[in-house]
């Protein structure tokens, strides 16, 4: 990575000295992408510096029209910086910019059918190279030379755009239906490419494509379909569509056979975590715990000055979910909770993703911990969880933090503060979870947290002698509970 960055920086400096703006934008954009892929603690800062270099040239004459694919890649990388830092507000605005550009490119940009990326070269380019490089440099009809690179077709780029749009949308909360829509559209694009009727379409398989290039493009589309389907599986979990999520697991398993060139452990790790999520969401806590404790999801060591990898993040999430299962004193593995929490804290408390920070503080409120041994200490710990959730506008985490706060501090209290807090928790849960089940006939129980918040609020209304309101709220809560998976329903009623 270090050598790649040095080479790209040298190209950028050389291009600046030659007033070769297209090359300069391209090399700065690629440098930003390499920084993000490097995973160092300074990667986002360094990527932003390279992005600023590229954007400083966006108003140069003809520069946007000459390299449309590069500007699209720059928007992708720019959005990725905000995703890495879990900055949901930045991500929202950058997502709008990216989508606007993609729509413009789809309608207007001159885009070679094979996805070839052409970088126009400045007048100081050694024109003899074009005659001796066998197609690496090409000459246009107007006599200008250009560098040709193999890249994504317009359809493939749009599929990537749908995938990134879904990730950015989920950053603010898991119940936004737009994420589901983006993934479905992305899958439609990719799946259409595999149909026999599509094989002779120029935008899918250009006639000039070599066998090696066509094979590589086909393999890329298979991996892209797998990744889109994986994201969709987690969206189904967020929507409480457990049957759809389970079907997705089977599709992912069968799809592994087609992905021979990919790291099997990496893909199996995702499948295992999705299976555990489904088991936990449907109340099969023993099965979920067993999967979370598999070697594939074991917490690995983290090298100094490195951001956590996907492997680290999945292991952290698996450990967090283990704690949610074993924290009750009655659980036969409760004795592991304190040690597991202690091993998690160095990885999670200062994680770059605020959702993980919020989750670890949330769990510290539950688990026997020195920081939350007193009422004041517990309030402070929960406040950290709330602040992290608010910083990224994550509605799902806010709902859960509010429910825990109300349960701990207002459960048997009558007063204005308790009334306001319990009602706020109920309204927030209802609004958040209502979005996940609108128009969803397959959902097996939208509104678990609405039921939790509604049940607590109904208790308060009864203590305030607002019996008619309490009765109506009980009926609404019972209707939600009736839709829950049987094992979840049993746990809810037991509590």
Give the location of each predicted region.
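Extended alpha-helical scaffold regions
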Residues: 1-495
């Amino acid at each position: 990575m270090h050598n790649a960055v040095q080479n790209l920086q040298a190209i950028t400096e050389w291009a600046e000295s030659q007033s070769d703006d297209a090359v300069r934008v391209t090399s700065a954009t690629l440098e930003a992408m390499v920084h993000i892929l490097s995973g160092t603690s300074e990667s986002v800062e360094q990527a932003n510096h390279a992005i600023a270099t590229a954007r400083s040239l966006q108003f140069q004459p003809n520069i946007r029209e000459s390299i449309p694919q590069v500007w699209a890649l720059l928007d992708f990388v720019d959005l990725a910086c905000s995703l890495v830092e879990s900055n949901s507000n930045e991500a929202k605005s950058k997502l709008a910019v990216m989508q606007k550009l993609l729509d413009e490119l789809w309608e207007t940009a001159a885009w070679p059918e094979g996805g070839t990326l052409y970088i126009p070269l400045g007048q100081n380019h050694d024109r003899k190279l074009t005659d001796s490089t066998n197609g690496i440099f090409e000459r246009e009809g107007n006599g200008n030379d250009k560098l040709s690179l193999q890249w994504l077709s317009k359809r493939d780029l749009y599929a990537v755009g749908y995938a990134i749009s879904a990730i950015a949308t989920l950053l603010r909360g898991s119940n936004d239906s737009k994420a589901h829509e983006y993934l479905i559209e992305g899958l439609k694009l990719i799946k259409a490419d595999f149909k026999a009727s599509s094989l002779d379409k120029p935008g899918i398989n250009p006639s000039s494509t070599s066998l090696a290039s066509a094979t590589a493009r086909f393999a890329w589309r298979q991996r892209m379909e797998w990744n889109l389907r994986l994201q969709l599986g987690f969206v189904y979990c967020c929507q409480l569509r457990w049957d759809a999520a389970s079907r997705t697991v089977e599709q992912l398993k069968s799809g592994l056979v087609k992905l021979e060139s990919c790291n099997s452990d990496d893909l199996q790790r995702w499948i295992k975590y999705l299976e555990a999520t489904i088991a936990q969401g449907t109340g099969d806590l023993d099965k979920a715990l067993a999967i979370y404790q598999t070697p594939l999801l074991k917490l690995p060591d983290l090298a100094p000055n490195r951001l956590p990898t996907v492997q680290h993040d999945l292991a952290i999430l698996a450990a967090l979910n283990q704690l949610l299962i074993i924290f009750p004193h009655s659980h036969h593995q409760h004795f592991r909770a304190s040690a597991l929490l202690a091993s998690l804290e160095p990885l999670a408390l200062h994680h770059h993703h605020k959702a993980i920070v919020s989750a670890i503080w949330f769990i510290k409120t539950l688990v026997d911990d020195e920081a939350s041994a007193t009422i004041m200490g517990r309030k402070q710990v929960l406040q950290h969880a709330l602040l992290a959730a608010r910083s990224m506008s994550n509605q799902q985490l806010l709902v859960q933090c509010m429910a825990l706060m109300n349960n701990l501090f207002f459960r048997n209290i009558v007063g204005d503060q308790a009334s306001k807090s319990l009602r706020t928790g109920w309204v927030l849960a209802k609004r958040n979870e209502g979005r996940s089940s609108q128009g969803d006939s397959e959902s097996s129980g939208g509104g678990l947290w609405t039921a939790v918040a509604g049940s607590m609020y109904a208790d308060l209304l009864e203590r305030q002698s607002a019996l008619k309101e309490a009765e109506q709220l009980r009926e609404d809560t019972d209707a939600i509970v009736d839709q829950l998976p049987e094992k979840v329903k049993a746990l809810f009623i037991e509590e």
